[in-house]
Amino acid sequence: MLHPRVIRLRFACKLTLAIVLSLLLGFYFGLQTPRWSALTAALVAAGPAFAAGGEPFAGAIRYRGWLRIIGTVLGSLCALLLMMLLIRAPLLMILLCCLWAGVCTWLSSLVRMENAYALGLSGYTALIIVVSCLGEPQFILQLALERCGEIVLGIACAVLADTLLAPRSVKGEVDRVVGGMLLGQLCLLQRCVDGRDSDAVDRSWHGLIRESHTLEGMRASLALESSRWPRACRRLAALHTLSLTLITRACEIFLTQRQTPTALPAPFLTLIAAPVKTPAEAYQRLKQLRRLLAAHGGHQLPPALIGWIDGASQLQLLAKGVASNVRIGRHEAAILAHDAAPRQIYSAQGHHALINGLRTWLATSLGALFWLWSGWNAGSGCMIMIAVVTSLAVRTPNPRMAAIDFLMGSLVALPVGALYYTVILPATQQSLVLLCLSLGALTFICGMEVQKRRLGSLGTLASTLNILVLSNPMRFPIESFVDSAIGQVIGCLLALVVLLAVRDRSRARTGRTLMRRLAFGAVAALRGEGTRGNLLPALYRQLFLLLTLFPDDIGRYRLALTLIVLQQRLAHSALPCDAERLRAIDAAATRLLTGRGAARRRGALLQLTTGLSDYADALVRQGAAGAALQPLHQLADVLHRYRGVLLG
């Protein structure tokens, strides 16, 4: 294994090669603004490195590149459409561009974090193209095509540099995580069966949920890394669902042990409690549990434990297939065929997304009006920086710190860019080698700092490349540099002011929406078999978002896990069907989820709890077993007891 310093040096060399190669090819092909291709190579390679805090995986660079291509094409098409329709009304055209940027930011806040970059980019790409062509609108098609071509060139250079200098495959990290998955699940089961240390159980649950979420992200990166891994990706998709199922089963055993400490027979308690330290020991323990289950016959055992042993056996089989990447066998094919496609649900951050879109639209519109009113030369650059910062920063976990990173980068880029613009670049005009060496030194230093997640490092690299006039041919008017540099700084500052002024107070509202969605998912498990679907991955995504918004709220976290456990228990229960009562329960749950106003939601929750209780009483009169009705009673009790969390 390479030393971490060697890995950091390797990525810095990759970043340098990508930027220098994009510039050389840009000058060779006679592109008008090779700066765009260099900036693209820098952002595609350095962006994932800053997010990961180290050298990014090869698949992450390719994924980022595809998102940038999609966003650029969408933004270019929007710019062409606006220019064709509103060429005679430039003010209205610019304001509609600002509205488009706001809409794209709003939509990017509703999609998954991994895909938000494409929508955010398409918003300010349209603004860049329209602003650049205001003086010569007849060249907008040429400018849009050139921008798309330079973006593709920069991405190709970033991918080529990563491929030439030993790409970092995500497969090794996937094998490490998958290899230790059974051990982690068994340790969680031990803590749940013991049940004395609730904090240790919470830590184990939290760690496994984050590990499963990370594994799902690595699967997307592995799929783009090479065409050798489609079988591994199929297995990883099933492993993700199996991991979440085992976590839920362990949580169910924990709740069962707290209610009935004698639910598990003594031989199972003794075997589970024995310590395990390595994945090999965990595999041997699983085989012992299977033998004990076969000898015991499954009589008087909690269904959760039987399901856990069965799921762990499937997980171990798929984990071996991921490591070897061999052809999918008959038993694996049966497991993969049984794994239903996960259901997609809408984002719970609608209010948060609306605020983000409002921030971008308001900031860019005010910047555009000020620019058109004042005639300031740097106004267009300032407005574009406002759009860039507000579009990208609001989708990060900490928008304020992301905006500060942009601001610090633009401030550092001012003296660094001045040195290059006034001294270094004019002195290297007669030698292409010296030009590449001078820019390579800057990108190498920034590449080392980006991997340390140094505040302002990524902003410095992007801002410096943006204000340097890397055009063909190159000219060095000092007024242009000063306007561009000052416009960048003021744009980042105004974007930070807008983020601080337009407060986002939707955290509590989003938390209540997430809890209501988890409750709705538990109630939805009462539907017929054909309409249930695989809700488990979607429910855990809601839980992961809940953990991100409320990292220290253990009570809310436990309540969410309880609702997920009840959803699984109800989904696998064999309750008699009462179509009329189930329709009433489903209608009340829908009103609880989508109802406007606290009074309506309060009434819907009362109808829901009453309907669940009536349904349970009706089943008792029909002679249903008490064990089958237990999750139904628990769900009604949880919804009534925690109505304050659901309604606020």
From Swiss-Prot:
Instruction: Give a GO biological-process term.
Output: carboxylic acid transport
Entry keyword annotation includes Nucleus: no
What name goes with this protein? p-hydroxybenzoic acid efflux pump subunit AaeB
Function noted in UniProt: Forms an efflux pump with AaeA. Could function as a metabolic relief valve, allowing to eliminate certain compounds when they accumulate to high levels in the cell.
Which organism does this record belong to?
A: Edwardsiella tarda (strain FL6-60)
For this protein, the record's Pfam families field holds: FUSC
For the keyword Lipid metabolism, the answer is no
TM ranges are 11-31, 41-61, 65-87, 91-110, 125-145, 150-170, 369-389, 406-426, 430-450, 455-474, 481-501
Q: Where in the cell is it found?
A: Cell inner membrane
Please list which residues make up the signal peptide: none
Protein's membrane topology: Multi-pass membrane protein
Please give the family membership noted in the entry: Belongs to the aromatic acid exporter ArAE (TC 2.A.85) family.
Tell me which UniProt keywords the record has, alphabetically.
Cell inner membrane, Cell membrane, Membrane, Transmembrane, Transmembrane helix, Transport
Give the InterPro entries listed for this entry: PHBA_efflux_AaeB/fusaric-R, PHBA_efflux_pump_AaeB
Kindly report the protein's main subcellular placement as a broad class. Answer: membrane
A single GO molecular function, which one? transmembrane transporter activity
Q: Name one GO cellular component term.
A: plasma membrane
- Per the record, the domain of life is Bacteria
